[in-house]
């Protein structure tokens, strides 16, 4: 169940990498919604019945326009990192650029597709998978990792504005620990509440 609190923040009632009964916060923005920015500082092992290649098979061939959007988001992230930013009133210094990692892109694409096809919005995917599970299933081993999600924003510029205006997401984008990034964008014209679904998966090998 999704419910709106008095501050205008949507609260999704489910457990997310926390004790039972925790709530995942979803912020409403003028262009859409953004899920609570998540970060993991130590690697966790995960098992899986598929090889990384098989796991990524359905997102290897991608719509050219979607892939272009993903590249634009990566470029916008690096522009922000180069310029420095203010996240929740706290100044963040310029940090080095992140580079594309195709395994993280696989994990991000899988999650954006999952949210659109199954019409939900959460860091927890089908099969109760966490972001860290998807990264490991895609073959990526990390020492630190983070995920940002968003929905309904129709352009790379709009989704970046939403993320940068949200403290947790902005912190993930401006975190110099992360060296790699994968972006996933998926569009579903009908049958999905928000149509446009976005995921950023950050990693530090």
Residues covered by each model-derived region:
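Bacterial N-terminal signal peptides that target proteins for export
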Residues: 1-10
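C-terminal motif of bacterial Sec signal peptides marking the signal peptidase cleavage site
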Residues: 16-19
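Bacterial signal peptide processing site
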Residues: 21-24
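Disulfide-stabilized extracellular recognition modules
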Residues: 26-29, 34-39, 44-55, 142, ...
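A short alpha-helix/helix-coil micro-patch that ends at or immediately precedes a cysteine
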Residues: 51-117
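Solvent-exposed, polar/charged alpha-helical surfaces in well-ordered, non-transmembrane soluble domains
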Residues: 71-82, 102, 106-113, 133, ...
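Bacterial peptidoglycan biogenesis and beta-lactam-recognition machinery
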Residues: 87, 121, 169-171
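Short, surface-exposed glycine/acidic/tryptophan-bearing loops
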Residues: 101-154, 173-175
């Amino acid at each position: 169940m999704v419910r709106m609190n008095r501050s205008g923040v949507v609260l999704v009632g489910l457990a997310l990498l926390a004790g039972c009964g925790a709530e995942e916060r979803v912020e409403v923005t003028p262009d859409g919604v953004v899920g609570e920015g998540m970060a993991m500082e130590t690697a966790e092992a995960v098992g899986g019945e598929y090889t990384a290649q098989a796991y990524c098979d359905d997102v290897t061939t991608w719509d050219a326009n979607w892939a272009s959007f993903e590249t634009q988001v990566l470029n916008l992230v690096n522009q922000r990192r180069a310029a420095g930013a203010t996240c929740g009133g706290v100044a963040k210094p310029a940090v080095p650029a992140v580079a594309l990692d195709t395994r993280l892109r696989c994990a991000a694409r899988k999650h954006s597709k999952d949210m659109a096809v199954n019409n939900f919005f959460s860091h927890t995917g089908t099969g109760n998978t966490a972001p860290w599970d998807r990264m490991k299933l895609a073959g990526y081993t990390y020492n630190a990792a983070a995920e940002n999600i968003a929905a309904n924003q129709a352009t790379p510029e709009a989704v970046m504005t939403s993320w940068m205006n949200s403290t947790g997401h902005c912190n993930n984008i401006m975190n110099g620990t992360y060296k790699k990034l994968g972006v996933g964008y998926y569009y579903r014209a009908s049958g999905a509440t928000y149509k446009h679904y976005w995921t950023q998966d950050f990693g530090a090998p």
